[in-house]
């Protein structure tokens, strides 16, 4: 969470959320995660763990031109409805599965690269903060890769405090949820809502199912997507983007460390849900705590946390010879940040990649 939350906060800033809307957004994510994990694990007796979409937050943070927070909420509602449709209409799920993995990975890599590069923009203004943290991340990742992002956050907070860059800390308080009526802006729906759905499905839900199946569980796809889609839809009006199946957290909860007996590992779900319910309760305080930290630190924490995912996505995108050109086209357009007809680069990157792939395969017939 230490590396993922700054990405969410970057997303809230990108769409112009107020402090109250930001607190509601973060708490809504906690509510959706807690409810999804609790319902799915208890009903299925499987360790089905939910999470918010970190790649989705990265997409929001890197999508320019969103006219208002309410327009972003409209995109969140659309993404949630599309997830529910995927649960109800099986051919739609098959269509998503037919998007080549290299194209999906290239779109994800382009989204993540923009946030990774953003941390280097703070080097000229805060070199004494950013550069030591980059060195710490490299060293920590070599010995304790799972704790590297947390180490950067903790060390960065201490370093920022010693440099006098930390604002006064907020008092502990409960979150007040704020309802937002969505605005239906066509460009935002197409440029943010559709890519958010695709990123959530391709980068979170499909790997989440793969982790569960690799651990010997056979979760029913439609009910799982229905629960996460419904949770996403309900909390979208609180300003929260999509929730989905977890992959990394699920790998922990589905392994022998959770319980020696695979049939009893589902118990991890309620405990996991309880933590996120507590997180939702004090979301405003958590947001206030992170808001007290300097932007350079948050950008560095987010960027270093995404380095591994970016490297993995780049490797998946460019590893195969057959689709490499199409993947490179998707990557280039997505990372460019270009906006056509008011629609963001992630959508156009996907379109260009699929177009290159279709032309290439047609000419090779």
Residue spans of the language-model regions?
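Solvent-exposed, flexible loop/coil residues
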Residues: 53, 173, 178-183, 241-242, ...
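Helix-loop-helix junctions within the multi-pass membrane cores of secondary transporters/permeases
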Residues: 1-9, 27-108, 219-307
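Alpha-helical membrane-protein architecture signal
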Residues: 132, 191, 226-230, 329
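Membrane-embedded alpha-helical modules
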Residues: 65-170, 271-365
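Helix-loop-helix hairpins and the membrane-proximal interhelical loops
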Residues: 1-24, 150-221
């Amino acid at each position: 969470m230490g590396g993922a939350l700054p990405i969410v906060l970057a997303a809230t800033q990108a769409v112009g959320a107020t402090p109250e809307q930001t607190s509601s957004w973060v708490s809504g994510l906690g509510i959706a995660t807690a409810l999804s994990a609790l319902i799915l694990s208890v009903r299925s007796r499987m360790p089905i763990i939910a999470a918010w979409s970190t790649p989705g937050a990265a997409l929001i943070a890197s999508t320019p031109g969103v006219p208002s927070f309410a327009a972003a909420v409209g995109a969140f509602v659309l993404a949630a409805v599309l997830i529910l449709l995927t649960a109800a209409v099986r051919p739609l799920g098959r269509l998503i599965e037919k998007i080549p993995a290299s194209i999906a990975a290239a779109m994800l890599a382009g989204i993540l690269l923009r946030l990774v590069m953003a941390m280097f923009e703070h080097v000229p203004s805060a070199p004494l903060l950013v550069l030591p943290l980059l060195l710490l991340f490299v060293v920590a990742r070599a010995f304790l890769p799972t704790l590297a992002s947390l180490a950067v956050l903790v060390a960065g907070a201490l370093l920022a405090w010693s440099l006098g860059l930390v604002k006064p800390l907020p008092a502990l308080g409960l979150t007040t949820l704020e309802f937002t009526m969505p605005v239906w802006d066509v460009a935002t729906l197409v440029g943010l809502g559709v890519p958010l759905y695709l990123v959530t499905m391709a980068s979170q839900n499909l790997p989440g199912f793969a982790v569960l199946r690799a651990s010997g569980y056979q979760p029913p796809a439609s009910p799982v997507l229905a629960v996460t889609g419904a949770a996403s839809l309900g909390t979208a009006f609180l300003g929260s983007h999509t929730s989905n199946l977890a992959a990394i957290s699920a790998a922990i909860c589905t392994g022998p460390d959770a319980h020696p007996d695979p049939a009893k590992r589902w118990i991890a779900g309620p405990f996991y849900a309880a933590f996120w319910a507590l997180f939702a309760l004090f979301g405003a305080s958590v947001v206030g705590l992170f808001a007290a930290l300097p932007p350079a630190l948050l950008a560095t924490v987010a960027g270093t946390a995404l380095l591994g995912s970016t490297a993995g996505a780049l490797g998946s995108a460019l590893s195969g010879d057959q689709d490499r050109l199409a993947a490179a086209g998707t990557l280039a357009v997505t990372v460019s940040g270009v906006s056509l007809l008011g629609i963001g680069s992630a959508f156009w990157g996907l379109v260009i990649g699929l177009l290159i792939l279709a032309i290439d395969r047609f000419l090779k017939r």
